[in-house]
Amino acid sequence: MANVVTEPTARTKAAARTRDAVKIYGKGQTEVRALDGVTVEFEAGRYTAIMGPSGSGKSTLLHCVAGLDTLTSGSAFVGDVDLSTLDDQRLTILRRDRIGFVFQAFNLVPTISAAKNITLPLLLAGRKGDQAWISKVIEITGIGDRLEHRPSELSGGQQQRVAVARALASRPEIIFADEPTGNLDSRSGTEMLTFLRRAVDEMHQTIVMVTHDPVAASYADRIVFLADGRIVDEMQKPTAERVLERMKRFGE
């Protein structure tokens, strides 16, 4: 199956992109080609979902373009920075200063309050942060009445709100979210997706989210579909029904 090359129009700036991205795990008979020549651009100020069957390369693509893993060949860029040109220290600084992350696991520091968890990346970077921006983040995520509570005193949904607020607090150029609703019940998951949607619409953030859930994907502006490590399709202005119908075709 040939790769579908997905690029924005000439007027659209890419917040992140890959070019002919290949990721191979193992060698010989155990070799797995997780990414097979993927070229894709993630547009600034938009919400993109990545979907595909299990083992299609969704999380591998996200991890490589976010600088959490390295490509076997090809290129990955955040803005105009080629990640392959950075040593470990510079890559760490880029992730800290320019990227926000939201994972299925909340990854909060258990011994400090929600408020301190939200601003911890700024503290580690030696930055004060924009207080007006942080206040807006707290408003959007609806965590204002729980700021002095430690993670153990919060529900799963509340902990994920704190994790999203932490990702937004540093005003990153792009946020990568890997199955962010995976550990949440239906109500908390819907709230989380609404927060991410508002972050794009009201705060002009850029979000790239891996998900297997058609309802979650319907919150995005665009969906990129992977199969066998290749981009096989994309969808603009998705609905849950259209996404579900498209996903069914992967089983044919």
Locate each region found by the language model:
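ABC family nucleotide-binding domain
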Residues: 13-220, 226
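Pre-NBD coupling/linker segments of ABC/ABC-like ATPases
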Residues: 1-10
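Conserved beta-strand-loop-alpha-helix hinge in the C-terminal portion
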Residues: 230-252
